[in-house]
Amino acid sequence: MKSITKLLAATGGILCLLSSCDNNMNPLLTDSTLPYGAPRFDKIRTEHYLPAFEQAIAEAKAEIDAIVNNPDAPTFENTVVALDEAGSRLDDVAGIFYNLLEADTNERMQDIAEKVSPMMTEYSMYVSLNEPLFARVKAVHESGVALEQDQATLLDKTWKSFVRGGANLGAEDKATYSKLSEELSLLTLQYGKNVLAATNAFTLNLTEEADLEGLPEFVREAAVETAKSKNMDGWAFDLSAPSYGAFMKYSTRRDLRQKMWMAYNTRATEGDNSNIELCRQIAELRLRIANVLGYATYADYALEERMAKTPQTVNEFIQKLLEPSLPAARAEVKELYEYARANGFEDSEIQPWDFGFWSEKLKDARYSISDEQLKPYFRLESCIDAAFGLADRLYGLVFEERTDIPV
C-alpha cells in the first residue's frame, strides 16, 4: 500500500503543476469544511463543473494506475478495496452535478452534461476494459481467500461489474462495445435535452377570465405568477406537474384540457426536438450492446442484476396484475362515464383529457371533499414534520434543523 501512496502523491504533484493549481479555488475540488463534508452549494457555480470533472477524472485515472502498477501480489485490500475507494472525488463531483441536473436543469447544465458524458464514458471504459486491472481482480476472485460476508459481496459485485462491462471480450468486441456505449450516452443526453426543450416551448396563456372557469383561486394565483415569470399578461399554464395537473383536474374548458393533454403527451415528437428517431436509435444501440456482451436482448442484460432477473418473470408478473386489475379498471371507467353523462357530459365516450376532471367531480360528489379542502392539512411544513415524526416513532430517529449548512 505504501507504493500506491507514493505513486499517488507523485502523480498528484504532477497534476497540480500541469494545471498550475488553478482549481484550488474551485469548491468542487477542495475538501469541504462543513459538517459531514456537506457540499458548498453557496459557492458552487455552473462554470466550476467542467474543470472539476476534468481534474477529478485525471485523479481517478491516477488512482487506477496506482492499483495496476502496484508491484505487490493482488489481494482483496490492495486491489478490490483500493478500486472501491478510487475516484471518490469524481463520485462527489458527479453526485452533485447529476442530482442538480435532474432536479433543477437548464440549458447550461444540459450543455455541460453533453460535454461531460463522453468524458465519463471514456473513464468508465478506462476502468472496465483495463486488462491489467481486471487481471488483478480476477486473481483475487479465483484465489478462494476467506472473506467476511460484506467483503465477499463487494468482491462479487466488483467481478460482475467487470464482466458485464466487457472485460472478457476480445479486442475487436471491446472496441465495438466502447464505441456503442459512447454513442448511447450521447443519444440519451440528447433525448433529455429534447424533452426539456419541448416542455419549455409550450405555454397556454389565457387573458380572459371566462377561460378560467372551474379553477380554484390558488390555481389562478399560481398561474398569474407563472405568467409574470414568462413576461406574459393574464394567466399562464405550462407542462410542469403542478401547473398541468391542476389545470387538467379543475378546468371546465374541455377544449383547453384537450390542448394541454395533447401538448403534454406529444412532447418531443416533431420538429427539431423530435425524439422519434432517437428512440429507435437508442433501442438499437441497447440491443447491439447486449448482443456484444452475449445477451439475447437488452432486457436480459438489464434485468440480470435486478430482482426480477429475467424478462419472463416480468411478463408473468404483469400478466398476474392484468387479470384482476383490468376488469376493475374497466368498471371504474364505466362508472366515471355514467356519472359524467348524468352531469352534462354529451360525448359517446370519455377521453384521456376527461379523466382527471370527472374523477375530481365524482370524488367531491361521493365524499364531499376536494383537494382544495385538503390543501391546508398538507402544507409542506406539516408534511415534513409528519415524515420526521414517523421516523422517530418507528425507528427512534430524531431530526434537527441545521442552519450552518448551505443548500
Predicted regions and their residues:
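Bacterial N-terminal signal peptides that target proteins for export
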Residues: 1-9
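Active-site-proximal, well-structured secondary-structure segments within enzyme catalytic domains
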Residues: 154-155, 193, 198-238, 285, ...
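Intrinsically disordered, proline/serine/threonine- and acidic-rich regulatory linkers
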Residues: 4, 23-24
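Short His/Asp/Glu-rich catalytic/ion-coordination signatures at enzyme active sites or charged loops
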Residues: 33-48, 97-116, 137-179, 238-277, ...
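C-terminal motif of bacterial Sec signal peptides marking the signal peptidase cleavage site
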Residues: 17-20
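N-terminal helix-rich structural modules
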Residues: 24-215
